[in-house]
């Protein structure tokens, strides 16, 4: 009988623990619309999200969901209609294109994460967050501007976990991820 070697695959630990519970209303959207270069991206969008809801946004229009997320996260301001986050919500956003967080960034991953944690964050804690997404030891000293697409996604997930938000806004988070990270 031949012994089977154990797998060398490592799985990240991805878990989100909010600092605070959400109240009775998470998000209310009323008659929201947006057009770009004369083209209506979406119009008359209205809904309300309650606690415990898990919502997926799907559209035939490539820009619609990403644009909607940018509006509710405050990145786009020239829209019609209104939206209101619940007073007890804190949001953490995973954008579809995360290159702006990494391109031209000459920081190590520890220092990259520190800019979102505050200058008083302990390096040991930052390394702990990075370790959860498989950047351990010397890998945590890798420069942020040389990461692959999947490594950038894992760093963004560490940033989001560290934020302890009670609302997650994820715009195509599994792009570039390896199978182990998707399963985690």
Residue ranges, per PLM feature:
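ABC-family P-loop ATPase nucleotide-binding domain
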Residues: 2-26
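ABC ATP-binding cassette signature C-motif
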Residues: 19-184
